[in-house]
From Swiss-Prot:
Active-site residues annotated for this sequence: 92, 117
Intracellular or extracellular location(s): Cytoplasm
Entry keyword annotation includes Mitochondrion: no
Organism: Chlamydia abortus (strain DSM 27085 / S26/3)
Taxonomic placement: Bacteria, Pseudomonadati, Chlamydiota, Chlamydiia, Chlamydiales
Subunit composition and interactions: Fourteen ClpP subunits assemble into 2 heptameric rings which stack back to back to give a disk-like structure with a central cavity, resembling the structure of eukaryotic proteasomes.
GO MF annotation, one: ATPase binding
Protein name, entry field: ATP-dependent Clp protease proteolytic subunit 1
InterPro entries xrefs: ClpP, ClpP/crotonase-like_dom_sf, ClpP/TepA, ClpP_His_AS
Keyword annotations of the record: Cytoplasm, Hydrolase, Protease, Serine protease
Top-level taxon: Bacteria
Amino acid sequence: MADGEVENKLRDVIERKILDARRVFFSEPVTDKSAADAIKKLWYLELTNPGQPIVFVINSPGGSVDAGFAVWDQIKMMTSPVTTVVTGLAASMGSVLSLCAAPGRRFATPHSRIMIHQPSIGGPITGQATDLDIHAREILKTKKRIVDVYLEATGQSREVIEKAIDRDTWMTADEAKDFGLLDGILFSFNDL
């Protein structure tokens, strides 16, 4: 058996063990592909044993808002209670994903970091003034959606949230807990 085949078999065994434990790991940027992969795993667990808890482990620098909200919406539609655990980093859309669990089910490991900020448009912006105006209105709608998520999750005022996301705001796990982004610090998966 070639090294590549052995590596693929090992990866499959590991993936199966993780899914059998009802864990889904999201350890990459939020893209259409990574979101689709996560959604497939989440729904596999939902359909094979509905209503049983799932742990969604996040280590992501963020990425696509639309792809992230696709994962968010799917989790909200499931009957299985989902617990989020940040390990490492939940930045930008990764931080939003960490909030898709119900209150009391949002955790981070002790050395994790959370970063929140307002959405941005990447790359060079070109087009007619009317098109640019459309893009500006769309990003403001996206900002409002994200602010609303942080408002609901944290209980902070709109003014506090808008100030916090005006620029990149980095938090330790303890700071994120104090801010209301987390319900607790997780020292062992046995504590879930």
